[in-house]
Amino acid sequence: MKASRFFIGTLKEAPADAEIVSHKLMVRAGMIRRVAGGIYNYLPVGLRSIRKVEAIVREEMNRAGAIELLMPAVQPAELWQESGRWEQYGPELLRFKDRKDNDFVIGPTHEEVVTDIARNQIKSYRQMPVNFYQIQTKFRDEIRPRFGVMRGREFIMKDAYSFDKDAAGLNESYRKMYDAYVRIFTRLGLEFRAVAADSGSIGGNFSHEFHVIADTGEDAIAYCPTSEFAANVEAAEALPLIAERAAPAEAMEKVATPGKAKCEAVAELLSIPLERTIKSIVLATDNEGAEPTIWLVMLRGDHDLNEIKASKLPGLKNHRFATEQEIVEWFGTPPGYLGPVGTKKPVKVIADRTVANMSDFVVGANEVDYHIAGVNWGRDLPEPEVADVRNVKKGDPSPDGKGVIDICRGIEVGHVFQLGTKYSEAMGATFLDESGKPQPMLMGCYGVGITRILGAAIEQNFDDKGIIWPESIAPFEVVLCPMGYDRSDMVRETADKLYAELVAAGIDVILDDRGERPGVMFADWELIGVPHRLVIGERGLKEGKIEYQGRRDAEATLLPADTAAAAVAEKIRAALAH
């Protein structure tokens, strides 16, 4: 590629609405341009990287035995009504009517459509396992699109769907996709972790998220540095921090805590560790035609409620936070002084695992400006219902018993689910088993955010000059920067020769023949993030040398002109192999 025949749309300044590094750099590097909120044009530089991501994903999906197809972006409402998601999905599902007043959606995902394909095409167990995938543009009507391609409304995604006759087959399909994702993100040159996760709105029982590690990541990941354990904080098991409950050592006592409604303030006033205080959170579940059920969830003062875990407890699936009016009615006091001792009306108490093993702890007295110290289970309170209802913290024991938890930030770029029969039962996708009886197909679904990967890669790979692409997804692998291409025969002939040698070696190279000043050339390609640069100048050529600099290198080095192309090609091959 010659730069004079390519479109390079770099900018010196980022738009005012760009909040994070990847959004700023993608605009400045000429990769994207905004059309509407969360909707972008992908300019030539950006599209080249997209196509490289797609190629790696496609190769690994094919290698894993998945079969490519293409489903429509526009889907009839009837399919979503069959699955039940027409009512469940919410305003993120873009709905519209055609001229005949029929309801349609723009697909944010394709479980319904692919299940419709399967129920019409798969009739026997002999036709399974099968795994269909596509790479396609999708639309999710985010309430607040931001961060460029990281939280856009329109995006490119690879989604795959497996169909199996039994649980063993589903497990095998899932394993193949999990392994394929590990290969994909390794080939993309990204630091990533696969974490156990909650299945969210897709549904299903078992899932993993793939996160690119970045300080700007939206998701908190709990992992163990000395083992393979990793999980989304929302899904990570929180073990009790006290192995065995100690015998009571204090008498229960009501203490004045004027104006101290927070655990931290109470601990400071009473000169006790925060870990001896209890945080009381009030949840409610509604009962048709009757007053709500009120739940008191007890956490250690330094711990936080995990709502996803709470929602999975019996009776709490559709919980909400209690209103202040309800709290006063049941406890006799506003929030800040709540506790399980002496409530006005009966409540259901759930203690986190750590709280269940505590002794001599401090709770609210259900009276403004008062708490109760020296509280103990069995003596002052009945034994509680015990459950894991908190988020893990740094320093907690790892659930696998092989170390302690650390926390990092991650950007979700892939997700794999075991759906089971959620969609096949709802939509009647059955097959005849070995005995001729109809059975629901077992499904898995597997997504990769193609455009989101670009943003995540940049969040992990940048400096004050611009993007630093891994070789595998850089728009170009090498840029040739000739000094005086239009003025010096020696420079032009050498640059053209290097270009031809690199092309012949299968290297993705661009020759900057625009005639720009060196400073402009260097700034453009550093901003765009090309991993390797060769500078051809008369002074160096007279000594038989060409200047080489990797995008991550602090200093340039000199290479023999006659072997420079081969040397750079070898660097690229080594990087891709690694």
UniProtKB/Swiss-Prot annotation:
Alphabetical UniProt keywords? Aminoacyl-tRNA synthetase, ATP-binding, Cytoplasm, Ligase, Nucleotide-binding, Protein biosynthesis
Catalyzed chemical reaction(s)? tRNA(Pro) + L-proline + ATP = L-prolyl-tRNA(Pro) + AMP + diphosphate
InterPro entries per record: aa-tRNA-synt_IIb (IPR002314), aa-tRNA-synth_II (IPR006195), aa-tRNA-synth_II/BPL/LPL (IPR045864), Anticodon-bd (IPR004154), Anticodon-bd_dom_sf (IPR036621), Pro-tRNA-ligase_IIa (IPR002316), Pro-tRNA-synth_IIa_bac-type (IPR004500), Pro-tRNA-Synthase_IIa_type1 (IPR023717)
Predominant subcellular localization, coarse grouping = cytoplasm
> Recorded E.C. number(s)?
6.1.1.15
Show the PANTHER family listed in the entry: MITOCHONDRIAL RIBOSOME PROTEIN L39/PROLYL-TRNA LIGASE FAMILY MEMBER, PROLINE--TRNA LIGASE
State the family it belongs to: Belongs to the class-II aminoacyl-tRNA synthetase family. ProS type 1 subfamily.
Role played: Catalyzes the attachment of proline to tRNA(Pro) in a two-step reaction: proline is first activated by ATP to form Pro-AMP and then transferred to the acceptor end of tRNA(Pro). As ProRS can inadvertently accommodate and process non-cognate amino acids such as alanine and cysteine, to avoid such errors it has two additional distinct editing activities against alanine. One activity is designated as 'pretransfer' editing and involves the tRNA(Pro)-independent hydrolysis of activated Ala-AMP.
Q: How does it assemble?
A: Homodimer.
The name this protein goes by in its record: Proline--tRNA ligase
Q: What is the species of this protein?
A: Burkholderia orbicola (strain AU 1054)
Q: Which gene encodes it?
A: proS
